[in-house]
Design a protein with these regions (language model features):
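Long, low-complexity, serine/threonine- and charged-residue-rich intrinsically disordered N-terminal tails
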Residues: 1-210, 215, 220-227, 231, ...
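Detector for Asparagine
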Residues: 71, 85, 159, 240-241, ...
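Dynamic helix-loop-helix/coil hinge segments at AAA+ ATPase domain boundaries and subdomain interfaces
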Residues: 89-93, 249, 256-283
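Interdomain "pre-motor" coupling segment immediately N-terminal to P-loop NTPase/helicase cores
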Residues: 211-267
Length: 283
């Protein structure tokens, strides 16, 4: 799987929970209960393994492109059976906060994909110094917590900074709304919904109307006003993987032999006559 990930230039390794349970059942259970303790170490080990399998120059390009964080260069996406953590938006309760969940529903709204700054680079002409600043928000899985959101414009002596936009690192960011399926909602009640935060390679994977399974970490975000909070938290799902429901039903599965035959037919001069005889041979 890792070799295939490198060949396809993908950034996310799918991990089936069934395989993880077969290897270590306690590890799989702890992953669902405390994903913040396991996801980043998983990704760091994955990056270290890929580093030994890739060309050093190519790997360094990936490090520079992602801002240099070893545990965020390559991600893991979980799938399989989630047991009691497999719910609908109506089943999301406080007991599932900070746990790995799988939520089924219909995508009703998808925001535009916007870049989110991960690292900014600033240059001061007066002092000839370069300053780097990394940013983490409440969506980050890091245990270090969110950083300040203040964007530096001048140094401690009042000298202005010039932002080097070409050296800054950005990450794609999108918010989608997942609503309960009509057949799953109790009769006479409105369907519930939940916001899902998608970043990196997960953006633009779904569109409104798609029936999907969203796998991610159920997080509570505190809203503050004048340094105070009401105690009511907004909850979102930090996306880890996206799986389509029923997308491959009735779809055409192409084998390498089929592709070879199609290319052979495409080289023939009488392809239109052949196609007409194949479509209506009895007329």
């Amino acid at each position: 799987k890792i070799r295939s990930l490198i060949d396809q230039k993908s950034k996310r390794l799918p991990i089936d929970l069934h395989d993880l349970r077969h290897y270590d059942q306690d590890l799989a259970a702890d992953l669902l209960d405390r994903p913040l303790d396991f996801v980043l170490p998983f990704q760091e080990v994955l990056s270290e393994v890929i580093q030994t399998m890739m060309d050093p120059t190519e790997f360094q390009k990936e490090v520079d492109l992602d801002g240099g964080a070893l545990n965020e260069i390559y991600q893991v996406g979980f799938e399989g059976s989630f047991g009691p953590n497999h719910v609908t938006p109506r089943g999301l309760r406080a007991k599932l906060i900070s746990k790995m969940v799988c939520v089924e529903g219909i995508v009703t709204k998808a925001s535009l994909v916007r870049p989110k700054v991960v690292k900014s680079v600033h240059y001061c002409k007066e002092t000839k110094k370069q300053v780097k600043r990394e940013y983490r928000d409440a969506m980050s899985l890091s245990k270090d917590g969110p950083t300040t959101s203040v964007y530096p414009t001048k140094d401690e002596h009042g000298n202005p900074y010039q932002t080097e936009y070409g050296l800054c690192v950005y990450k794609d960011h999108q918010t989608v709304t997942l609503q309960e399926m009509p057949e799953s909602a109790p009769m006479g009640q409105l369907p519930r919904s939940v916001d899902v935060i998608l970043e990196g390679d997960l953006v633009d994977r779904v569109k409104p109307g798609d029936r999907v399974r969203m796998i991610g970490i159920y997080r509570a975000l505190a809203g503050t006003s004048s340094g105070q909070t009401s105690g009511i938290f907004r909850t979102v799902i930090i996306g880890n993987n996206v799986l389509q429901i029923g997308k491959d039903v009735g779809g055409v599965i192409m084998t390498p032999n089929d592709i070879q035959n199609i290319r052979a037919v495409a080289k023939r001069n009488n392809v239109f006559n052949l196609l007409s005889r194949s479509l209506a041979p009895s007329i």
